[in-house]
Each structure stands twice: as structure tokens, then as C-alpha cells.
Regions:
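Phosphate-handling substructures
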Residues: 1-40
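Short, conserved phosphate/pyrophosphate- and ester-handling motifs at nucleotide-, phospho-/glycolipid
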Residues: 64
Length: 154
């Protein structure tokens, strides 16, 4: 096993990351999220954000699954490895985080929904399962229907 992967502070020290740029991308993602939130008055302090005048603003980000889970890991204080390997969100899905200020000036994030596809269901549109391996081994690396392969995506 790789027990370090579960540790929010030490997952990058695992042997899997001794080469490559994941460490640099992780630090850039953390800094970018903190800089964005600072523009809204939220200053990172450990695993929470200090905010003198929290507002009910909405911030919308469009990003790839990998970066999204890195951002969520940073905001929730969990190793992104758990999210990368334990969650699946399809293209065009919606994930919603909210802030809570239980103590005046202390803001934390909570995930309200992850990978919501209700807009596709409402329009009777199919969703991709390409991010998943089959539930039972088939020799294929995708769960998308075979006819999607011939058409590019769908």
C-alpha cells in the first residue's frame, strides 16, 4: 500500500511522485485558489479562511476533473488522491461547494453536490461513463457503449 497518499500534508512524498511535476502543480493550484479567495476577502489560515466581511457571492469555475479535485481537496483539507481515485464526475457535470461561517470571521467549505447531471437528465441527453472502468472486468478501459467509439464521442 501507499499510506502517505491518505495524508493531506504528506501525500506528495510518496514514491509515486518522486518524478514529474505533480508537486509543482499542486502548489500552484493551492496558491491560485487562495489568491482567488483573497480577492473576496477570504485569507487562508490553516484549514479555514479568515474573513472580516463574508458575502454570499457565487464563484463559478470551469475546469478539468483533475484540477477540480485538487481544488476541492485543498478547500476541504483532504488529500486529493482520495478524491481522484474515489470520485467520478462526468463531462458537463456540476459540483457545488458552499461556505459556512459558524464562528464570526471563520469560513469553511462544504460540498453540497458532486457530479450533478440533472441538466442532462432533464434534456434526455446521455452522459459519458468514460472516466469509469467497467464494474466487472471486460478487457476494455472504458464503460462507454462501443458505438460511441466509432462516432468519436457519441
Amino acid at each position: 500500500g501507499h499510506p502517505l497518499l491518505y495524508d493531506v500534508n504528506h501525500w506528495m512524498e510518496d514514491e509515486l511522485f518522486r518524478v514529474g511535476t505533480v508537486d509543482a502543480i499542486w502548489r500552484e493550484t493551492q496558491a491560485g485558489m487562495d489568491a482567488l479567495l483573497a480577492r473576496y476577502g477570504m485569507i487562508r489560515d490553516g484549514h479555514l479562511y479568515r474573513c472580516e466581511n463574508n458575502q454570499p457571492d457565487t464563484i463559478v469555475l470551469f475546469c478539468h476533473f483533475g484540477i477540480m479535485m485538487a481544488c476541492i481537496g485543498h478547500l476541504l483539507g483532504v488529500s486529493p488522491m482520495l478524491l481522484w481515485h474515489g470520485f467520478c464526475t462526468q463531462p458537463s457535470s456540476v459540483t457545488t461547494l458552499v461556505t459556512e461561517e459558524r464562528v464570526k470571521g471563520e469560513v469553511v467549505f462544504r460540498c453540497m453536490q458532486s457530479g450533478d447531471l440533472s441538466h442532462l437528465y432533464a434534456a434526455d441527453e446521455p452522459y459519458s461513463t468514460a472516466a469509469l472502468f467497467p464494474e466487472c472486468y471486460t478487457g476494455r478501459d472504458s464503460t462507454d457503449p462501443p458505438e460511441w467509439d466509432a462516432l468519436g464521442y457519441r
